[in-house]
């Protein structure tokens, strides 16, 4: 099911006076399709509902459902699932870097990297079963992961400024406004969980937006040029970190204080942490909530509004600037922009 992002900017006398960010996501419809299903049936439906980050959606859902059912996957299973999510993140990040940001990678090398990701993911697919058993030692998987790490090391991608300079120079004189929201941290999970239990699934903490993933690590830069460069650099660094983590996958953040029949699952995507919360009632789904990185990064009071309000930019440049900044924040849905001249 596809969502859509709408961003409207009001420009007056060469200054951005207002930014309206509206993210439309079919989360209530998705929830209705899953409520009433058994865990196994819900997991069979998930791949039909999500295109991007499909593996991460599956992993987060599995973790939530198994926790709600009172079953804890052993460390080897969790490590394999984390690897599966990271392989998807690597693949999606590479495609984004090449297709959107024109990372200069020879086509044959890109194809080889993507093929290694697919081959390794196929060896881990059995772990997407509910209450999956650990996989036997797999020399082919380990060899594929080693080949992926070697291929990435051999690639030696340049710094974003080296290949993006003509694209960035256009925005060197555009000074951005106030600071973006704070980054979401694992310490805030209890507060978020309390909100979700109260049927408040907004991507905020105590009424305040947060940032996640590469968007959070990019920081607040003075100019639009520097901000875009840092976002692309953060995505590049995240890709390298994901490849490194395949050798020793980290455990997902622990979620304490869950009630009987309640489960929360987290999975890292190319854009940040994905969260599913599930409640089971007599073995059937009673509640299903999810928050994705795009929900956080495109909050109505998020980085677009905070960084763009009050910014001076030529009328003929504002749409192109807006599109570049949206692409830098990397939404997982299609978007459209509208410029209103006051």
Curated annotation (Swiss-Prot):
This is Hydrogenase expression/formation protein HupK. The gene is hupK. Belongs to the HupK family. One of its GO terms (molecular function) is nickel cation binding. PANTHER family: HYDROGENASE EXPRESSION_FORMATION PROTEIN HUPK, HYDROGENASE-2 LARGE CHAIN. It holds the Pfam family NiFeSe_Hases. It comes from Azotobacter vinelandii.
